[in-house]
């Protein structure tokens, strides 16, 4: 799947032992078939290694199992950033406002 040109995005969860996979990753082949990589927790070691060895930007965030109860706001953010590539700097989440400005 990592080297399949038809696959555009890979989500994977965290997991103890992710760091043990690093010596077995073929970074050259990943660079030849770039895609979006998204994970969290222990998967960060793999995300950082992919970036460090390929200059491909990786993403820390949602994994598929967390999409069951995703809010509309989070769904819009995810789609605009990673699917459509049309993200704006800021999408308002609610009509809340600060009573007193913070630091």
Regions found by a protein language model. Give the residues of each.
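N-terminal small/polar loop signature for handling phosphorylated ligands or for N-terminal nucleophile
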Residues: 1-33
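Conserved active-site and cofactor/substrate-binding residues in soluble primary-metabolism enzymes
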Residues: 16, 41, 45, 73
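Short glycine/serine/threonine-biased micro-segments
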Residues: 12-13, 37-40, 100
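Short, Φ-rich (hydrophobic/aromatic) sequence segments
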Residues: 1, 48, 75-79
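Short, acidic/small-residue loops that bind anionic groups at enzyme active sites
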Residues: 27-49, 57-64
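Conserved anion/nucleotide-ligand pocket segment
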Residues: 55-103
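Short, glycine/charged-enriched secondary-structure capping and boundary segments
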Residues: 24-27, 52-54, 74
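Short glycine-/acidic-enriched loop or helix-start segments at secondary-structure transitions
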Residues: 19-22, 47-49, 70
């Amino acid at each position: 799947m990592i080297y399949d040109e038809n696959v555009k995005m890979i989500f994977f969860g965290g997991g103890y032992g992710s760091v043990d996979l690093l010596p077995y990753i073929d970074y050259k082949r990943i660079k030849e078939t770039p895609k979006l990589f998204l994970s969290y927790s222990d998967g960060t070691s793999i995300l950082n290694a992919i970036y460090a060895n390929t200059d491909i930007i990786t993403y820390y965030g949602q994994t598929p199992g967390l999409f069951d109860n995703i809010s509309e706001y989070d769904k819009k953010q995810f789609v605009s950033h990673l699917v459509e590539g049309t993200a704006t700097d800021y999408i308002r989440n609610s009509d809340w406002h600060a009573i007193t400005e913070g630091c």
